[in-house]
């Protein structure tokens, strides 16, 4: 489906000119540049129907990669093939098979009703009338579009506009959809609707989806697989569940108990579990590394040595894990 081999993108940034007439004149005839490696030797293979989270900090190379995968940018070297096509060289044919959402950038027409934008896109992508009617009904139900179809895009709230954007991106039943920060700035309810919609479209049509986001709940809800990039270089590529196991993820056990009786543990947990008391000493938070302590054994020790009123186990969030990777 998507095959990326030894992909590189180098931006040339003009060097700052030193003060002085001679330096300015020299630069006029022989401009010098610094090379900035936005993406370095990236190789990926993405199967049909996968939802892949492509994540990293600002400036890591995510958006540059997506722009090359969508045919907006031409790689400096290496190759990209999507369904056998080169996104840049075969762009006019290629774009008919993809859908794209770039954060706040709209593909809808600002001054006309949403339904008219969708009808124009229907003609652009040559969507048969029967398919258009069926998809519009499906999108209206899934994204609650009925209330906004006859409003112009400029009248819509951000959440309403993004629901319409998703309908536009999936209207022509693309084989691949690229989502670059699709839920940025949205409230919790709209995010949930959009995640649910994307999941349904993936399951119903086996659509391949590439997602970049800073909202890591999007990743946890949607993605089968995660690729982590840093300074243009791939750091991790595998199932989301492996992210938790491969790095020093922490787990927290929160217990409530009689504040007059401090928490006791067996000797085997000495120096492995950090205990912090809060809420007037009636609540204790026990933090430890997954690889050092078995949660079940710790809980057994807690129950054997203490009178516990309540107990909650919390895993590290993927955001905390990613942060720990970057500070290494």
Model-derived features: positions:
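ABC transporter nucleotide-binding domain
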Residues: 195-285
């Amino acid at each position: 489906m998507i095959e990326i081999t030894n992909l590189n993108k180098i931006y040339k940034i003009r060097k700052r000119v030193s003060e002085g007439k001679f330096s300015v004149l020299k630069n006029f005839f022989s401009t010098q540049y610094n090379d900035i490696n936005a993406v370095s030797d990236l190789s990926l293979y993405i199967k049909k129907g996968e939802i892949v989270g492509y994540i990293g900090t600002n400036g890591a190379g995510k958006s540059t990669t997506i722009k090359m995968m969508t045919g907006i940018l031409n790689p400096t070297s290496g190759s990209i093939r999507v369904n056998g096509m080169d996104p840049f060289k075969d762009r006019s044919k290629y774009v008919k098979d993809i859908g794209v959402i770039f954060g706040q950038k709209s593909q809808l027409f600002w001054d006309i009703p949403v339904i008219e934008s969708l009808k124009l896109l229907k003609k652009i992508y040559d969507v048969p009338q029967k398919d258009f009617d069926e998809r519009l009904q499906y999108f209206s139900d899934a994204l609650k579009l009925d209330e906004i179809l006859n409003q112009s895009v400029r009248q819509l709230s951000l959440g309403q506009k993004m629901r319409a954007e998703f309908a536009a991106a999936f209207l022509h039943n693309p084989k691949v959809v690229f989502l670059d920060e699709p839920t940025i700035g949205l409230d919790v309810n709209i995010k949930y609707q959009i995640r649910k919609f994307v999941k349904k479209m993936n399951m119903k049509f086996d659509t391949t989806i590439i997602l970049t986001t800073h909202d890591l709940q999007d990743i946890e809800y949607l993605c089968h697989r995660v690729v982590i990039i840093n300074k243009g270089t791939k750091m991790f590529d595998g199932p989301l569940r492996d992210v938790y196991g491969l790095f020093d993820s922490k787990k927290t056990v929160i217990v409530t108990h009689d504040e007059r009786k401090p928490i006791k543990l067996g000797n085997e947990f000495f120096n492995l579990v950090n205990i912090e008391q809060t809420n007037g000493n009636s609540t204790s938070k026990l933090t430890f590394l997954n690889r050092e302590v078995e949660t079940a054994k710790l809980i057994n020790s807690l129950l054997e040595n203490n009178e516990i009123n309540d107990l909650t186990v919390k895993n590290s969030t993927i955001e905390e894990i990613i942060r720990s990777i970057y500070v290494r």
